Regions:
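Extracellular, surface-exposed repeat architectures
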Residues: 1-65, 69-70, 95, 99-192, ...
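Glycine- and acidic-residue-biased ligand/ion/polar-headgroup-sensing regions
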Residues: 64, 80-85, 189-192, 207-212
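Short loop/beta submotifs within extracellular cysteine-rich repeat domains
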Residues: 85, 92-94, 220-222
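Short regulatory "switch" loops immediately downstream of catalytic or recognition motifs
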Residues: 162-165, 213-219
Length: 299
């Protein structure tokens, strides 16, 4: 069923409780309260353009899947609360910030450039497409649920990843390939962030709070810590790099200035690992392997 839009402005919320579409030829969808709320309990498609009249947030709630298929014009926040938002085309979210709270943003092979990204037990998956950040990435701890990013993640500029500390072994897992000629700083949040992709970003990796944990060995010139020669800095109290049983496929220079009691360089895994990159001690630091061996061959 298609619900045609007869005018460019609506008042109130939209409830989708069956397989309905919201469409409008040459029509822009707006809300007079400057906010659009879609309550989805079924699968649906919004092919009308959501215009600049929506200055406030566009919020998707419910258990259904909503597909945006137009290049939308609004630049405010997009909040996905437990629902699934699927991109039916590229650039459906314009440049606004995105919050995923227990839901999913599925780019479905398309690409999009957004603002800042906040995940609270949320999932972003791109398929063959790429989501490019226009701001920093923040995850908020939510009990026993990790935040997940899969596919391809473009940095767009130097970025800070702020990871909240929850009950999971890994508070956030990014298996997406991270790309861009920029730096990555894990800052502020005390949570555990896992990088599990063969990342191609070319800037310095800095860990200034919490733990960055490896989830892959890397291949060729790419590693979970970016391309060869970037360097990684563990800096400040409470920061650590956990090899997690993975021996990097290439050498990565490492500078340790961290003072985390469990070790600035760790191996919290039963597997023995080798670290073959040059390690420089910028301050007193601890290197520890709680389970398997940690062999250092270049210091």
């Amino acid at each position: 069923t298609t619900l045609p839009i007869a005018s460019a402005s609506l008042a109130g919320n939209i409830l989708i409780n069956s397989a309905n579409d919201i469409a409008g030829a040459n029509t822009t969808l707006g809300i007079t309260t400057n906010e659009l709320v879609i309550l989805a309990t079924a699968n649906s498609t919004v092919s009308a353009v959501i215009g600049t009249a929506v200055a406030g947030p566009v919020t998707l709630s419910g258990t259904g899947n909503v597909t945006f298929s137009a290049t939308n014009l609004y630049t405010g926040l997009t909040a996905i609360n437990y629902a699934t938002l699927t991109a039916g085309a590229s650039n459906v979210l314009s440049s606004g910030a995105v919050t995923v709270n227990g839901g999913t943003y599925n780019l479905n092979g398309n690409s999009d450039t957004i603002g800042a990204l906040t995940l609270r037990a949320g999932t972003v998956t791109t398929g063959a497409g790429t989501i490019t950040l226009g701001g920093n990435l923040t995850t908020i701890a939510n009990g026993n649920h990790a935040s997940i990013v899969t596919g391809n993640l473009g940095l767009g500029a130097n970025r800070v990843f702020d990871i909240g500390d929850g009950l999971m072994d890994n508070d956030a897992i990014i298996s997406a390939v991270i790309s861009g000629a920029f730096t990555v700083t894990k800052s502020t949040g005390a949570g555990v962030l896992m990088f599990a992709g063969d990342n191609s970003y070319t800037g310095l990796t800095t860990i200034s709070a919490g733990t960055l944990r490896l989830g892959a060995t890397g291949g060729g010139t790419n590693t979970p810590l970016g391309t060869i020669g970037n360097g990684t800095l563990v800096s400040g109290a409470g920061s650590a790099l956990d090899l997690n049983g993975y021996t990097l496929g290439t050498n990565e220079a490492l500078t340790l200035s961290g003072a985390l009691a469990a070790g600035a360089l760790q191996n919290f895994s039963g597997n023995s690992v080798n670290y073959t990159g040059l390690i420089t001690l910028g301050a007193a630091s601890t290197i520890i392997s709680n389970y398997g061996d940690l062999n250092i061959t270049n210091t």
